[in-house]
């Protein structure tokens, strides 16, 4: 899988722990592919596990 996890909207994806997840649009993305993702983030709020502060997040910029 692409390290940026740029799969199509609604598709499945297999994000790895090292996935930067800059374009996470996967409905099945429930792994720690986002280092941080605020609750209100439209791009990374698909069940990703947040592991950092929103100011360190690049996927929602």
UniProtKB/Swiss-Prot annotation:
A divalent metal cation 3 binds at residues 15, 19, 24, 29. A divalent metal cation 1 binds at residues 5, 7, 21, 24. A divalent metal cation 6 binds at residues 37, 41, 44, 60. The modification N-acetylmethionine is found at residue 1. A divalent metal cation 4 binds at residues 33-34, 44, 48. InterPro entries: Metalthion_dom_sf, Metalthion_dom_sf_vert, Metalthion_vert, Metalthion_vert_metal_BS. GO terms for molecular function: zinc ion binding. Keywords: Acetylation, Metal-binding, Metal-thiolate cluster. Pfam families: Metallothio. The keyword Secreted does not apply. Belongs to the metallothionein superfamily. Type 1 family. A divalent metal cation 7 binds at residues 50, 57, 59-60. A divalent metal cation 2 binds at residues 7, 13, 15, 26. This is Metallothionein-1. GO terms for biological process: cellular response to cadmium ion; cellular response to copper ion; cellular response to zinc ion; detoxification of copper ion; intracellular zinc ion homeostasis; negative regulation of growth. Residues 30-61 are annotated as: Alpha. GO terms for cellular component: cytoplasm; nucleus. Metallothioneins have a high content of cysteine residues that bind various heavy metals; these proteins are transcriptionally regulated by both heavy metals and glucocorticoids. Residues 1-29 are annotated as: Beta. Class I metallothioneins contain 2 metal-binding domains: four divalent ions are chelated within cluster A of the alpha domain and are coordinated via cysteinyl thiolate bridges to 11 cysteine ligands. Cluster B, the corresponding region within the beta domain, can ligate three divalent ions to 9 cysteines. A divalent metal cation 5 binds at residues 34, 36-37, 50.
